[in-house]
């Protein structure tokens, strides 16, 4: 039996990664989100949580959890703190994803294993995957989506984007690039076509 194909979906903020992963999941793929995994570590009573508290201070604890809003306020705009936080979280996230993959392979229920990894190239993790799908969208469109979804500011969008490497570089490295500058229906159709093509390689 061939190993289950490992595919990462990546892209800049508000490019459409989560929407693409939802389509893949609807079509039967196993989907895991690196962001959701990292959020699961944001509790004060774990070793990871304690390391984050030591880094950022006890004021990030709100209602017995580590506040993502408080963390974001501290690290976005402070590159050193952000990188230190990532050094704590990313190895744990990658370990969790790899363990989950091993379990999913044993289940033999899914045609594809999809992992949404926003900072895939930035943390040098692309080589673990068999293929990388990059979701691409123009900056202005992404900013509009971000502001509409989060109610945040232009500055908060720019700070989040600052951590990401250049889109041009990622386009050259990705196995598949799906553009998302049009309607949701157009984008979902492209993702479905991609799913069919990927299944054909199994």
From Swiss-Prot:
Sequence ranges assigned to domain DPCK in this UniProt record: 6-202
GO molecular function: ATP binding; dephospho-CoA kinase activity
EC number(s) from the headed UniProt entry: 2.7.1.24
InterPro entries (UniProt xref): Depp_CoAkinase, P-loop_NTPase
Reaction(s) this enzyme catalyzes, per UniProt: 3'-dephospho-CoA + ATP = ADP + CoA + H(+)
Residues reported to bind ATP: 14-19
Pathway(s) this gene product operates in, as recorded in its UniProt entry: Cofactor biosynthesis; coenzyme A biosynthesis; CoA from (R)-pantothenate: step 5/5
A GO CC term attached to the entry: cytoplasm
Domain of life: Bacteria
One BP annotation, GO: coenzyme A biosynthetic process
Localization: Cytoplasm
Function: Catalyzes the phosphorylation of the 3'-hydroxyl group of dephosphocoenzyme A to form coenzyme A.
Family: Belongs to the CoaE family.
Protein name: Dephospho-CoA kinase
Species this chain originates from: Chlamydia trachomatis serovar D (strain ATCC VR-885 / DSM 19411 / UW-3/Cx)
Gene assigned in the entry: coaE
